[in-house]
């Protein structure tokens, strides 16, 4: 394990593997650097890249200086990029894609960007969480009820059936890992900034996010995620859409399908 100090003094923990251009992996809600699929993806990509797999603020071995603000997470990513030599490729998954996108918007030196199924809602008919989703998630954590926060976030935010959450509670190790990062769920909700509730994607992204971008969707994914990926690819000026079976993230990341696609994108014209 390595660590870097973010602008506000928070320690951000990361693992580094491989040799080649720097590539930073940004996990989504409930993810952390020891999440099995994230470890697998880092390993597969390490053949071509120096992969930085980090614990986002509040997770794993990273610190959690309060109060939280989205800009702090952007600074964390900037600190990692500085540690990696001043520029890097970045892959972001789900809410991690939202973080990577917002970092690029703020001018963080990301040379290529892969956005993997950001959970924006872009069509009226798509499933939306309740309008008070962020507030209610935060209230449950503030009231020291992480189990309720997990169930609420998964069922109302991610659209998971209640029985799936129930099954997770009885799987050894799974529930305890979820409880350990539950307090960061309001951070993910804040990162999504209303876009999960149907807020329109800003036209300003055409001018502020010009880096080569790969937007990824799985053809088996829910319609709302596919609509989001397609809308985002159409919004960003230098984006391409990758749409294939097996690239979804709502069940289990198929790292052996995802890694060659990421390698081809990041290594093109290198």
Q: For the regions a protein language model found, what residue spans apply to each?
A:
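Conserved serine/cysteine hydrolase catalytic core
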Residues: 177-234, 243
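Conserved catalytic-core motifs of eukaryotic protein kinase domains, centered on the activation segment
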Residues: 35-37, 62-67, 125, 226
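Catalytic active-site module of serine/aspartate enzymes centered on a nucleophile-bearing elbow/loop
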Residues: 238-270
